[in-house]
């Protein structure tokens, strides 16, 4: 991928590959912008990756490349680009954003997706119909 080659050459970008989950929060704390790099040939491209919710929980800017058929799930808190040129512009915007209003909103999305919150919601629904 020519874009990855370009990114590897930047002094402030580090492509480290998979890391143990226990280390992820430390890495996320060091990000200025969370980049969502997706492969276009993935069959599950319509599924929101777990990392998006992890990124949201940091409150930091997120830039993702959208596939042509993909719907923007969080247009108010994630920068979604449809071309490489737009991706570059979105990264610049993300670095320059004022986080005062959007960071808490991102964290709200992230906490709403927490497994404990989801489990509580399922329990509430099942209790409401007498199955729990």
Give residue ranges: language-model regions.
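An anion/phosphate-binding loop that grips the pyrophosphate of nucleotide cofactors and donors
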Residues: 31
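Nucleotide-sugar-dependent
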Residues: 22, 27, 36-56, 63-73
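A charged, aromatic-enriched C-terminal amphipathic alpha-helix characteristic of glycosyltransferases
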Residues: 99-130
């Amino acid at each position: 991928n020519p874009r990855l080659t370009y990114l590897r050459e930047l002094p402030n970008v580090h492509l480290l590959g998979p890391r143990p989950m226990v280390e992820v929060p430390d890495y996320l704390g060091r990000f200025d912008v969370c980049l969502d790099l997706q492969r276009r040939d993935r069959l599950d491209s319509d599924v929101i990756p777990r990392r998006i919710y992890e990124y949201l929980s940091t409150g930091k800017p997120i830039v993702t490349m959208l596939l042509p058929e993909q719907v923007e799930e969080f247009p108010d808190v994630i920068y979604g680009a449809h071309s490489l040129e737009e991706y570059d512009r979105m990264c610049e915007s993300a670095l320059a954003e004022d986080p005062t209003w959007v960071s808490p909103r991102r964290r709200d999305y992230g906490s709403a997706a927490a497994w404990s919150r989801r489990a509580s919601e399922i329990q509430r629904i099942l209790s409401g119909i007498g199955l729990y």
